[in-house]
Amino acid sequence: MKITVENLKKSFGDRCIWSGIDLTFTSDEIVSIAGKSGQGKTTFLRCLNGLETYDDGRVSFDGELMPAGTTDAKKIGMVFQGYCLFPKMTVWENILLAPVYHGVDRKEAEERAERLMKELEIYEERDKYPRNLSGGQQQRVAIVRACMLEPEILCFDEPTSALDGATIDKLAQTMNRLKEKGMGMIVVTHDRAFAERISDRILHFEEGHLREEIVA
């Protein structure tokens, strides 16, 4: 899969956050987006996922235009900062909600959930509520949930925030396993060391402009 971004522009009121953004993302790479707070990194992810609109430009998935505020949930997914799990639903219910809503056969969805949860070592926690999980466990639940529609590219918003070193190591391993299975990733992070560790490319948003570097 290939995401193409052409001449994208986003403003909040009179303030232009970024403009003239031209990028491509593919499902065989991990790309990190770095930059100071307030540079519009998370907003960019939300635009790609159809959660916010942009002012001008084009976003296309494999050549198919995605109008502002729309997306294809079977091609791109997102793991939010803070995970956004439903507190009154069990882990199992959280994970099955999206595929059932999107019309995936219940039995198929349950089999997929079990397989993914076992791969990420979270299956034994399936009957618990989010409040009873550690931060790392909640994140793995959020990753499984985001993978349930089998997107080709998965976005992460500040995935290392509030995680300890050992949990960050497990996250890096999880991302590498997903990449080996053919899933690309776009990762917003302030953690420079983590970005260098996982990324094929690092993008920097600075004062509305974009700079790119290749990670050796």
Predicted ranges, named:
Residues 107-124:
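Conserved ABC ATPase "signature" region
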Residues 49:
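Helix-to-loop junction immediately C-terminal to a conserved catalytic motif
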Residues 34-36:
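The feature captures the beta-strand-to-loop junction immediately N-terminal to the Walker
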Residues 148-152:
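A short, proline-enriched helix->beta-strand linker immediately N-terminal to the Walker B motif
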Residues 129-133, 137:
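Conserved ABC ATPase signature
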Residues 154-157:
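Catalytic Walker B motif of ABC-type/P-loop ATPase nucleotide-binding domains
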Residues 3, 18-20:
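Conserved structural motif at the start of ABC-family nucleotide-binding domains
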